[in-house]
Amino acid sequence: MWLYYLLKTMSTVISWLPYKAVVVIGKGMGHLYHKIAKKQRVRAEETIRERLGYSQEQAEATIKSLFVKLGITFMEIMYMPALNKDNIRSLVTFDRPEVLWDALKEKHGVVMLACHMDNWEWLGAALALNGFPLSAVEKPQPNRVYSDFMNELRKGVGQEIFSRGTSEILGCARAMKKGRMLGLIADQDGGYDGIFVPFLGKMASTPNGPAYFSRKFKAPIVPIFIVRKPDGYGHKAIVRDPIHYEFTGDQKLDDYNVTLKMTQEVEKIIKEYPDNWLWFQHRWNTPYTPQEEEKQPDEK
């Protein structure tokens, strides 16, 4: 339990700081992280060169900016107990919140599509504190104590949390039936159960959860991404147009098409804000084989 109390104490102390101090300290931590995390840094630089065609100089500059942002993000996560309905509006601004409200009015629930951009934890916090009925699925970390601490922070700002490996499917279904927003991170490797679609020029196994819940409940998928403001202080939440599941009678094709559309939205935001995405994650971990190619439906 020592780790829990350490994290709790750190979070309490950091929450007392002015937000500007949180950002300044975070920048320093990010610079340090960039120097010591050689494995992640090299992997990120290699990936961005391969996927976006960057030169070594461009890759190094972009990934350094990413690491600095990650340092700020760590501090901001510890700062989450200080967030409330009053200050969140100045820290995270939404460009088109009406799109989210209109999607909720369809009364089928909403699949909120997010990715590992910037501080995705604050995206969930901002949605919940702005009154959106948000439920989300979290992937348990190897350290159970850390996962419990993070879930405590998430619930503290009003999110309903389901953990993978429990009865999360049932919980998600109930949330959708209640007309809530279901937050799903869909830029991770989907394993052998995922749907292979092109992603940044390479076939990638993509989680099938958004397609499943959109199909099951006839719910719109609303891509929403958070990016850090240029000066490092605060964030902007970018809301894209809803994606609706199209029923043709061929479920496999329909799942593929909606997954392709949402993946293309993730691609667009990454290319627009490349130093906000987590380039060192193992996104293409599941190999794409000729057998998988035969399984993919023809694109229309």
What is each model feature region?
Residues 106-166, 172, 189-195, 232:
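Catalytic core of membrane glycerolipid acyltransferases/transacylases, capturing the structured
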